[in-house]
Amino acid sequence: MPASTGVATRALRPARTVVRWAVRHGLPAVYLDRGARHGDPVGRLLRDGAVRDEPYPLYEELRARGPLSPGSIGLVTPSHAVASEILRSDRFGVGWDRSQAPRPIRWALAFGDELDATGVAEPPSMLVVDPPDHTRFRRLVSRAFTPRAVAAFEPVVQRTADSLLDALELRSGVVDLVETYAAQLPVLVIADLLAVPAERRADFLRWGAAAAATLDPGLPFRRYVAAERALRAMHAFLREHMARLRRDPGEDLVSRLVSLPEDEALTERELHATVMLLLGAGFETTMNLLGNGVVLLDGHREQWEALRAAPSGWDGAVEEILRHDSPVQITGRTATGTVSVAGRQVSPGTRVTVLLGAANRDPDVFDEPTRFDVGRPNARDHLAFSAGIHYCVGAGLARLEGVIGLRALSERFPALRVSGRPVRRDLQTLRGFEHLPVQLR
Ligand code: HEM
């Protein structure tokens, strides 16, 4: 790029930031706030802090309205059957046709477009692209997550958990289990998978938290600016990291992605989107699984004791934690054609908010759904990892980390108790704890 163009680009950066925020967060916030004021459940869910802390009563209100009801931005479903149908349907996609958007929005999207400010839920992240691009990205990534590849990760996860627990042995009094364990384990495991230096983990945690915030629509301007700063730092790191692995490749997933043969090679933007998604999705969700699990088991002490006595039950326990308090609560799809769902005609372009956390408490599928029971026979029928072509590619690894992480913790600190008030993260799409004070002994 000529120097003058670079200077011009930098000079436009603040304006771009404002436009990007306005179109991605400012405008949705106006709609959602208006909806919330008129009692719209989706508006309340996404905009009301009290509902964010405890969304389950609102899900039940929605369930009473039926399996698919109108909200401020399209339709919304709390139903397991409808969510499964939509997530698996080829009449729904994750992308949206920008060419159909009003002209000012198209202009804003084009003007605000910049690789280094792109978040994990923006194209070309595989989370938000449809086939054939989705198929292409997914095929490349899923090679690293075959059952055999995940099983090979078991010693890494165990070793990482053990060394974190060794460090915890030296602590006394109340410790924050998120900071010392629940966040550390997944970030170290994903660092290993992507060959990123473990010393940078504090940066990843900071960047990941900012990236996670951008998943929620309607972010206030200041939080967006902070998030964008973190995204820029993350992209700068990725650029360096990929250049290093191009020069000196290893056996890891990123080395493989940057040295694909020409006919499969990803563009620079696609590489950034893919690695950034893996990095963020790899720990932002799993830390919630661990934190939510500890709090649930602390509240159901007899089940913690039963798992200590019979550790083979941890597989089922992790499924029940995922079901009962799902780390990802919300996703969405857009109808690509006219389609009939739950007796309703859905027209092309209609957005459906899919409440995974509500589907996982659907009484048509789960007996007494609010009861937490690690022995629940069909807990694994949950949609915590979604369904269809976007089904979580890292589900096997997440399950492994959940089982090893919680089992190892219970073995090392059998008397562990939550001590003080756990603090929820200020997020809607992801559900987990920011702080989790515990007494280890
Ligand atoms: C408890 C932990 C986790 C949960 C609850 C979770 C949940 C999810 C969900 C719900 C989706 C799909 C969203 C949708 O359908 O719109 C998803 C997609 C994805 N997850 Fe996970 N995830 C977890 C851990 C992981 C891990 C450990 C990794 C990677 C190492 C990962 C990588 C991905 C990727 C790359 C996608 C996009 C897949 C696609 O679009 O085809 N996740 N995850």
List each language-model region with its residue ranges.
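Cytochrome P450
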Residues: 1-441
